[in-house]
Amino acid sequence: MPKTTISNRNINADMRYLKLLARDFPTISQVTTEIINLEAILHLPKPTEHFLADLHGETEAFQHVLRNASGNIKRKVKELFGNTLREKEIRDLCTLIYYPKQKLELVKQNDTDLSDYYQTTLNQLIAVCRNVSSKYTRSKVRKSLPPEFAYIIEELLHESSDDRNKQAYVGVIIQNIIGTGRAAGFVMAICELIQRLSIDQLHILGDIFDRGPGAHLIMDTLSKYHNWDIQWGNHDILWMGAAAGNKVCIASVLRLSFRYANMQTLEEGYGINMVPMATFAMETYADDSCKVFFPKIEDPNRRPNEKTCKLIAQMHKAIAIIQFKLEGQLYQQHPEWNMDDRKLLETIDFEKGTCCVDGTVYPLTDLNFPTLNPANPYQLTAEEEDLINRLQHSFLISDRLQSHVQQLLLHGSMYGIYNSNLLFHASVPMNQDGSLKKIDVEGQTVSGRELMNRVEELVRMAFDED
């Protein structure tokens, strides 16, 4: 009798949830079917999770890692064909899976009659696809199938040519794919399916943006990707702040872009108008070599000509001074941040050409500051004020940038917990003894998880139109 009372009490407490569940599962048979399904799924192998961090705009490397699943696809191919294919044949098959369109074009150049090639390759690809899909339910695989070939691929995945009763059936399907001229399209579709099934969930632990030229292309890929999340990095937050119109973030984003000569993301990616920036920099620093502001470029193939490098250096110096001024204004407005040690412009001795940082005097490597007023170093000139306002407008009206930031908000967070793994970017503030450091955030002292939650709350509030 007591058990019945407790049970009834629990049922009454959970009645709201039971009513909600009853909408989707109104009958006993539907409930039991769902229980059986979920319990069975729990006994499948754990789907493949993929972890990437610090992409920094390197889109080519990112795309290659997605295509080969960091070597996971090659490992599967070796498991299946290691004893039957030569090393070169394994490499060729893997290349086909990673880059099907390009590989097929090369094959067509070397061979006009591809019937035998397609016959062999299709059987190999079906075997690889069957292997990578084995972790998932049929329902999940079905949802991943390309609509154009969904029925055919599903039949081939679940019917084996080893079954004597189905040999003719499978053989005729493959022959007709080739005979109807659809082999190339089918190969590309199944290769892309293998890529997709090889990564069930993609975790990005911060910093899509920074020095590389293709952050916008990475975001385009992620916007169409089937399952991904991101734990925001410092560079991601900078771009999100810039998209929100924060002038300090805009100046910082531009300075870092000029530092690495990353103009593609700004101009080609997001359509940011650089003409006002270039005009201001050339006029203000016309007679300045700006040698300490020349861009850092590791890849010689990406290095612009000297004239362009000089212009980028001028823009780099111009926006750096604007950033230091805006940061100083921000620290003055928020003394509770205790960041007076970052107000460096006021430590400059213009006569001696030095600055003082943490009590140590350093000689300046550049002494030409035509826009700095020693009496009020953080005040923008009228021209600087006009420039930063125009740049702010460009960031606010960039539809592609705003769309990408919405994707970061939709899929992102300060930290994530997946399969008992704690994911976050870079570091968490800590004391010398290893305990979590308490930080004052708008009058609230928080640390660890509470700090992360509070920061994320502030980020989302900044984009909440309500």
Predicted feature residues:
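Feature recognizes metal-dependent phosphohydrolase scaffolds
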Residues: 1-466
